[in-house]
Amino acid sequence: MQRIESVFAPSAEERASYIIEGVLEIPEGVTQIGEDSFSDCSEFYSVVFPSTLVSVGARAFARCQALEGVEFNDGLEEIGEDAFAGCTALEEIELPASVTFIGRSAFQCCRSLLCARLGCAAKHIRPFTFSYCTALQEIILPDTLEYIGCAAFCGCSALKEVAFPESLKAFDWVENESDGNTIHGVFEDCSSLRSIYIPEGVEKICDDIFKGCSALREVSIPSSVKTIGQMAFAGCSSLACVELHEGLETILGGAFGDCPSLCHIDIPESVKEVDPGAFFDSGIPGSPKSEDF
C-alpha cells in the first residue's frame, strides 16, 4: 500500500502531479479533497478515505479508469459534481449515513458499476447522477430521499427494478438548460426495467420519465398524482396494464404513446383533460397513429 503524506490540489490549475500505483490511502487529518485532485489518474485501483474526510471536490476522481473500489468513511458529508464520473472500472459503492449531498453527474458513465447502496441522508439525487451506468443492476435509495433529478438514471440499461421510499415527493421534469444540451427523463431508456413502485405523495409523473423502458409491464399511478407528463411512458412496448386512480386530472401528449401492448385503460372520472395524442400508436382501439400528428 502506498500512502500519500501530503496532497493539496484545490483547482484544475494546481492538479496533483503524483504517479500513484495500487492503493491510494489519503492520510488522517485531511478534511477535503480539492477539485480535479486525481482526475485522469489511471494507475491506482482502490481509494481509502480517512475518518477525518468531509468533502470530495468536483471531478476529484473523474475518469480514473483503473479505479475499482472506494472505501467511503463515516463522517463524509459531500460528494461533488462529477466526482467519480467516467470511472469505468468502479464496480460497487456504499455511501455512509453521514452523506447529505451528492453532486450532479457524480457517478455518471461508471459503466462497470453493478450496485449502488445509498444508505445516506441525502434528500436529493441530482440530474445525471447515475446516468449511463449501463451495468447497474441494483440501486438502494436513501430513506430520506425527496427529489430525483432529470436523467438521474437515464440509460441504465441493466436496471430491473426500483423501489422508491415513502419520503419521495417529486421527480424532476425536463429542465431548460442554457447550454442547449438535450435533457432526458429520469429513467429514460432503462430497457431492462420491469418493476416500479411509485409512492403516495408524488403529484406529477414528469415528462419522459420512463420513456423507452421497453421491459416495463405494469404500473400503478397513486391517487396523489395530478398530472402524467408528455411522453412519460412512450415506447414502453411491453406495458400492458396501467392502473389509474381518482385524483388524476391531466394526461398530456404522448404519455402512453407507442405502447402497442396497452389495449385497455380505465380513465378515472376526476380526469379533466386527455391530450388527443396521449395514446398514439397504442393497442387501444381507435387510438390515433403517429402519422396523424
Give each language-model segment a name.
Residues E14-Y18, V186-F187:
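Short, conserved catalytic or adaptor-binding loops enriched in Gly and charged residues
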